[in-house]
């Protein structure tokens, strides 16, 4: 079992590493490519676009051909794209490399969640996804630090060579450690069960909405945090970095505590707790009389996301034993596109950073609480499938 957990964690971590590691080198990248930092900031959106594009096909391919046939090319593409970025001499080529990086990371991301659905029952999967969420929270803190240490001795291109090395490690794991987990092709008698695993299932759609809104909350916070903390609240850059590190610490602590909480409380209780924390955070930020109270509200955001997101993802994947790849893709596309659409629309309409965050917190909590209370699983689902090793 440990081989599946190690491989899944490695596959997922390519995604945040590809986002956070290069940011520290952005000024030098812009200077070398004769582009402005503002022009290269689009590299984040291009990377997410690549991930979303991969998710359009990766899940279906993973369900038809297996998890390894998607993970291996995905890791290989991430390696090639990382090298391509390091060799880019224009901003156009650099952005093209970032899109290809996103494609590779997206393939690996989808496969990771499908593997966890294949190999774990509902309760263990919720615990593992909570742990995975905690580990993912470490990357935004450690990746820039690692990038800074690399750039003390080497040029910015070395950042992408480091990403390529990470991709090689994931590729080796996928080739030699990961065993195929896709359930064997269903017999004729299993076709009704396969057809019943509809993406239009009310319970699945409710969890898609909940997880998409939750991701929108956390990405809105990350996207607006420089404005909130440095421009509105007046913190210096060093203080901003310290606060963000502390929020990551809160996220990690809660994420690592959630598996223990699942041994005491029902998953539904933790999901309700998550949304109550979001609502409390929104109200706190709306009426905050001081910076200290506002910072407390921010910690509630991090705690709320960490206590509920892994549980909601586990519930969303639960009904899908034969279509776990497609379900994972659907969740990923909804989360990436939904959160990006909200942030873009709020910017176009001219909603300020503070109100943008308060608005999504309150909307997420109200909608999600209603869905949690009124949309229950339609039927019991198989805890997990027996793992079939394919040659």
Swiss-Prot record:
GO cellular component: plasma membrane
UniProt keywords, alphabetically: Cell inner membrane, Cell membrane, Membrane, Transmembrane, Transmembrane helix, Transport
Recorded GO MF terms: transmembrane transporter activity
Record topological domains on the Cytoplasmic side: 1-3, 63-68, 114-130, 179-202, 266-268, 314-330, 377-391
Source taxon at top rank: Bacteria
SUPFAM superfamilies: MFS general substrate transporter (SSF103473)
First-listed, main subcellular location of the protein, grouped into a coarse class: membrane
Stored InterPro entries: MFS (IPR011701), MFS_dom (IPR020846), MFS_Efflux_Transporters (IPR050189), MFS_trans_sf (IPR036259), Multidrug-R_MdtL (IPR023697)
Membrane topology recorded in Swiss-Prot or TrEMBL: Multi-pass membrane protein
UniProt-listed Pfam families: MFS_1
UniProt topological domain (Periplasmic) ranges: 25-41, 90-92, 152-157, 223-244, 290-292, 352-355
Subcellular location: Cell inner membrane
Transmembrane segments annotated in the record for this chain: 4-24, 42-62, 69-89, 93-113, 131-151, 158-178, 203-222, 245-265, 269-289, 293-313, 331-351, 356-376
PANTHER family given in the database record: CHLORAMPHENICOL EFFLUX PUMP RV0191 (PTHR43124:SF3), PURINE EFFLUX PUMP PBUE (PTHR43124)
Family: Belongs to the major facilitator superfamily. DHA1 family. MdtL (TC 2.A.1.2.22) subfamily.
Name of the protein in its database record: Multidrug resistance protein MdtL
Species the sequence originates in: Shigella sonnei (strain Ss046)
Encoding gene, per UniProt annotation: mdtL
